[in-house]
Regions:
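Active-site phosphate-binding strand-loop segment of PLP-dependent enzymes
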Residues: 9, 109, 120-173
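Conserved PLP-anchoring active-site segment centered on the Schiff-base-forming lysine
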Residues: 87-103
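Active-site C-terminal subdomain of aminotransferase-like
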Residues: 14, 190-271, 285
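Conserved active-site segment immediately N-terminal to the catalytic lysine
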Residues: 166, 180-191, 200
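Conserved N-terminal alpha-helix of the aminotransferase class I/II PLP-enzyme fold
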Residues: 32-78, 85, 99-100, 108
């Protein structure tokens, strides 16, 4: 019997995705090998990589001004990766501090440049998303964590700023439509919404790169991975394949509009019961901060 999983960690995957992923472990693409055994330089995997990127672009309506990357290291690696690639020591990044993940990103960013915490809900144990704050001019970018699984909060209004947004969307990527033009970088570990742990989706606006003065290690330079088509080093083949299957499923369900409606309906069922039943007590004090995820 399949369990219902309310964990803040890796989420369940559609049954059809699990079945196809299981078949590929035994033999992939009629090639006599498991997908766990094929070369990342093979035509079979090149086709997987191309389709996965194509689906990401189609579902999220991503233009060619953005690169789509499939990287290792998890979203936590992106906490410093983004700063290394975007922020010079004398420049400042703005942050919304809305939970443990944003706090970790702030810590890592301070290694490479200045940080301006625009607003924080830390003193109230992150039980809401801050609303009344100003974003000064001159920031290199503004970093947000779009959804906070631990605290049950989600950004429903993006910061008003001329600076590009950098967003950790690990736990709500492709759960709703977003104004992509506001974002310079979006990154997300796959295990919440897109597949198993092991691959991180990164969407980066290419014109933002190449502006830092520091020398970057090849493995930590977005431009190297863009040039290498996410194969500069051996990519996480199987997680990317399962991501492809999950993206196919999202497309079949009706894309982001359908996902958004489904999540709104699901969240309403839960919150209605929490509000109605005296045995439950919600931890998010501001209803507008409640997560749909």
């Amino acid at each position: 019997m399949k369990k219902i999983n309310f964990s803040a960690g890796p989420a369940i995957l559609p049954t059809s995705v699990l079945e196809q992923a299981s078949d590929a472990v035994r033999e992939f693409d009629n090639g006599g090998l498991s997908i766990l055994e094929i070369s990342h330089r093979s035509k079979s995997f090149s086709n997987v990589l191309a389709e996965t990127e194509s689906l990401v672009r189609e579902i999220a309506e991503i233009g060619e001004e953005y690169a789509v990357l499939f990287l290792s290291g998890g979203a936590s690696t992106q906490f410093f990766y983004t700063a290394m690639n975007l922020l010079n020591p004398e420049e400042t990044a703005g942050f919304l501090d809305t939970g443990s993940w944003s706090a970790k990103a702030i810590k890592e960013t301070k290694l490479f440049g200045k940080v301006n915490v625009l607003a924080s809900s830390k003193e109230s144990n992150y039980n809401h998303i801050p609303k009344d704050y100003n974003v000064p001019e001159g920031l290199k970018y503004v970093h947000v964590t779009s959804n906070n699984t631990i605290f049950g909060t989600q950004l429903h209004n993006w910061p008003e700023t001329s600076a590009p947004l950098v967003a950790d969307m690990s736990s709500d990527i492709f759960s709703r439509r977003i104004p992509l033009e506001k974002f310079g970088i979006i990154y997300a570990g796959a295990q919440k919404n897109l597949g198993p742990a092991g691959v991180t989706l990164v969407i980066v606006r290419k014109d933002l790169l190449g502006t830092v003065e520091r020398a970057l290690p090849s493995m930590l330079d977005y431009r190297v991975h863009i040039k290498g088509g996410s194969t500069y080093n051996t990519p996480p083949v199987y997680p990317i394949y399962v991501m492809m299957l999950t993206l196919r499923w999202i497309k079949e369900q009706g894309g982001l509009e359908a996902m958004e409606k489904h999540n709104e309906k699901k969240a309403k069922l839960l919150y209605d019961e929490i509000d109605r039943n005296p045995k439950f007590k919600g931890t998010v004090t501001d209803e507008e901060s409640r997560s749909l995820m």
